[in-house]
């Protein structure tokens, strides 16, 4: 129901804002003379931009689906090898003590536990290309256990919110963009991103647990979380002792090495258990094509709505309003120019990435004597990019793949986690870089 309201809201709010911009242009001389408000032909042409955005986003949706089709076909093939060879079942048994408490409605020995863990691992390593297919595989497994096939189950919501909180231990993509932009130390956002994503994950977990009446302390989940926190802190501390060039190499190579090691392990176990690896791969790969086709209407609808909202200028006004309010209450506003990346990230990953890169370019053009990627605002944009996930895109893709129409409180919980990530990102950004 909430997703329905948001979908309508993107269109209606976008239309109303655009209408006000056109009216403002028609009375531009009076408004400039009396209020100091300036309207240009850009405001007059806003409806043309909005209509064009519908075609652009529809095309973008299909481009994403075509890309996903190849990736899904590949990774569902690998996952099928893992299932037939027994690797996924072994992983399920390993994580079942913790998952039994976090997902009480999932049987302890169900293979979906392994798919969920594989997805979490890929996300933590910053391997987005493999995380999505693994996540969709997990959603299909959860749908098998779901008594109401058009309504999101409790395990689905918990899984999706933890997914959208975007816990990342190695933010490979953000560091790569910073290196490409000429940052002196591309990895210096590593720790802030980890802290922000961990905060978002914890708040997301607490929020969903509140909805689902899961007692984190009584069930022992808090103990698991504390243990995981200690492991992460120790691991990060060890990495930070490395020289920066070595750290960049480790973070770049480490995640991909682990991923390929998992694939090879799947192959070895399957071969050992006398599984026809090639036939198993083909059987799993067929599911990739079928799953991707199901996603198309959900993805087109959501991305077109986001495109309308963005092209109307609403997001720009929202950022300007936030800057005005923050300045009004006396808080430092140096981070405000980076907010477009933060606000765009839950809506569109590519849009947020574009905002971040535009920020780099803007400060690079100012000839400050150092790389534009090293400006405080650029570092804040980098942390925002790495600290939250594309909530609406993820919901559209994951629920679309299994035809879930009633999302219950998924959106609310996901956005609460995103907000926690953004607030933490601002705090750690000031602590580390301001």
Residue ranges: model-predicted function:
Residues 45-144, 273-366:
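Membrane-embedded alpha-helical segments and adjacent helix-loop junctions characteristic
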Residues 130-131, 138-179, 183-213, 342, ...:
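C-terminal transmembrane helix pair
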Residues 1-70, 179-310, 327-329, 384, ...:
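Signature of multi-pass transmembrane helix bundles
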Residues 113, 150-153, 260-261, 335-336, ...:
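Short hydrophobic/aromatic segments of transmembrane alpha-helices and their interfaces
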Residues 37, 117, 121, 156, ...:
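Generic signal for short, ordered secondary-structure residues
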């Amino acid at each position: 129901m909430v997703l329905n309201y948001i979908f309508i809201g993107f269109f209606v709010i976008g239309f109303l804002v655009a209408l006000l911009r056109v009216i403002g242009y028609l009375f531009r001389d009076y408004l400039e003379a009396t209020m100091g408000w300036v309207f240009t032909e850009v405001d007059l042409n806003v409806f043309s931009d909005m209509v064009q955005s519908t075609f652009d986003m529809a095309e973008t949706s299909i481009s994403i689906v075509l890309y996903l089709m190849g990736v899904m076909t590949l990774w569902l093939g690998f996952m099928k090898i893992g299932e037939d060879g027994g690797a996924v079942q072994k992983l399920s048994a390993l994580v079942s003590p913790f998952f039994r408490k976090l997902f009480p409605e999932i049987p302890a020995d169900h293979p979906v536990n392994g798919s969920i863990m594989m997805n979490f691992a890929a996300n933590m390593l910053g391997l987005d290309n493999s995380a999505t297919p693994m996540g969709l595989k997990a959603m299909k497994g959860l749908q098998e256990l779901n008594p109401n096939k058009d309504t999101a189950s409790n395990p689905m919501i918990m899984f999706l919110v933890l997914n959208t909180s975007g816990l990342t231990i190695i933010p490979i993509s953000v560091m790569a963009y910073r290196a490409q932009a000429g940052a002196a130390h591309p990895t210096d956002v590593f720790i802030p991103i980890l802290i922000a994503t961990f905060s978002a994950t914890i708040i997301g977990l607490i929020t969903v647990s509140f909805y689902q009446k899961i007692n984190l302390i009584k069930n022992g989940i808090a103990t698991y979380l504390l243990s995981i926190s200690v492991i992460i802190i120790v691991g990060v501390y060890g990495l930070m002792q490395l020289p920066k060039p070595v750290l960049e190499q480790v973070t770049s190579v480490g995640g991909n090495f682990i991923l390929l090691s998992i694939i090879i392990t799947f192959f070895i176990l399957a071969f050992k258990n006398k599984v026809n690896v090639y036939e198993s791969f083909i059987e799993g790969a067929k599911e990739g094509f079928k799953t991707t086709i199901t996603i198309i209407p959900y993805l087109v609808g959501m991305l077109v709505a986001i495109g309308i909202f963005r092209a109307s200028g609403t997001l720009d006004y929202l950022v300007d309003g936030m800057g005005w309010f923050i300045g009004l209450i006396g808080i430092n506003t140096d981070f405000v120019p980076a907010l477009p990346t933060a606000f765009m990230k839950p809506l569109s990953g590519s849009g947020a990435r574009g905002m971040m890169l535009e920020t780099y370019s803007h400060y690079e053009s100012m000839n400050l004597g150092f790389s534009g990627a090293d400006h405080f605002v650029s570092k804040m944009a980098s942390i925002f990019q790495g600290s939250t996930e594309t909530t609406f895109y993820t919901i559209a893709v994951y629920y679309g793949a299994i035809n879930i129409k009633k999302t219950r409180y998924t959106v609310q919980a996901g956005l609460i986690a995103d907000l926690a990530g953004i607030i933490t990102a601002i705090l750690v950004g000031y602590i580390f870089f301001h």
